[in-house]
């Protein structure tokens, strides 16, 4: 690089830092990439049992600034997901539905220390474009686009309950903490519309009414960590700074009511007719557990996680993911 240009850049950065408030002189930017898979088994008295297998890839970024007792941040993510739904009749498969989804989300949050814990308030927007296809190459039905949009706002309080640490003169220091959390979230789902088509043309138009829901969550987290001091030489700089393992368990409850779904066909025809059905309210209670492990370096982190959840007696799911994230500084 040009020495003069390098010096000018350093001088500009120093001058900018001198004139900016201390709160924005160190603004971390976190970027990440993750991949995961999930399997969901559904069995209800009103429909045939089915299994959904999904694979997803997510890219996310966050900008956070603040001080010791408060934080303000913006987060965004983009997820592409492929799903394979298999309906079953006994031991034989009857029908498969392949689908893809592109999902974007953005969130603004404020996090502040409340007593010995932390409270977080957020506003979140999520939009997804779903595509469906079922059948063989020549005889099939497909829905090219079903746009879904969700707005939500929530509050989460986290409280450390017990903690301990042990210092080591020759090896890594150790620490552990047990925390509890509780939160409440309001969600609004916009109307959605899509058309099933065959090679001959439109078959059915689906219109889903808007809906609202309130979700509550409560649970606990146990975290244990090993802390490594930076050493001399190349290995001392690149070795991990922290290894941690955590176990999270939570109980979630959702109250949302039913949602009307209108089915119209043939779409746009002179003989079109409409039928209004009611989508059942989701299961009221759901529990989930997650086991996670992470390796942290000075400016990056690698995370592994696996989870299992159950909603009532009809929905069981399990999955896992791996994520790599990096920390950058704007200034």
Identify the meaning behind each predicted range.
Residues 1-120, 124, 141-331:
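Secretion/assembly modules of Gram-negative surface proteins
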């Amino acid at each position: 690089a040009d020495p003069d240009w390098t010096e000018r850049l350093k001088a500009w950065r120093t001058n900018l830092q001198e004139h900016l408030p201390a709160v924005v002189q160190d603004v971390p930017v976190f970027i990440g990439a993750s991949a995961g898979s999930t399997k969901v088994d559904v069995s209800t008295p009103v429909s045939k049992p089915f299994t959904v297998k999904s694979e997803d890839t997510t890219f996310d970024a966050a900008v956070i600034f603040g001080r010791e007792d408060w934080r303000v941040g913006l987060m965004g993510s983009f997820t592409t997901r492929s799903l394979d739904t298999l309906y079953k009749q006994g031991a034989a498969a009857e029908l498969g539905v392949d689908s893809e989804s592109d999902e974007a989300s953005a969130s603004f949050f404020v996090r502040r220390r409340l007593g010995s814990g932390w409270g977080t308030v957020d506003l979140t927007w999520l939009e997804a474009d779903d595509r469906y296809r079922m059948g063989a190459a020549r005889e099939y039905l497909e829905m090219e686009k079903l746009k879904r949009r969700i707005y939500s706002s929530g509050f989460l309080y986290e409280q450390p309950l017990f903690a301990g640490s042990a210092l080591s003169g020759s090896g890594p220091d150790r620490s552990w903490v047990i925390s509890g959390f509780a939160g409440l979230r309001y969600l609004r789902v916009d109307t959605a519309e899509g058309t099933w088509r065959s090679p001959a043309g439109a078959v059915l138009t689906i219109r889903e009414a808007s809906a609202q829901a309130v979700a509550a969550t409560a649970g606990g987290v146990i975290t244990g960590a090993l802390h490594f001091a930076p050493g001399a030489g190349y290995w001392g700089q690149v070795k991990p700074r922290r290894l941690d393992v955590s176990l999270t368990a939570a109980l979630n409850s959702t109250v949302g009511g039913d949602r009307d779904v209108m089915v119209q066909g043939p779409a746009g025809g002179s003989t079109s007719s409409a039928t209004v059905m009611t989508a059942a309210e989701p299961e009221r209670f759901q529990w989930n557990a997650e086991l996670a492990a992470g390796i942290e370096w000075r400016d990056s982190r690698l995370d592994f996680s696996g989870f299992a959840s159950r909603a009532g007696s009809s929905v069981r799911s399990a999955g896992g993911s791996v994520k790599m994230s990096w920390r950058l500084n704007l200034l």
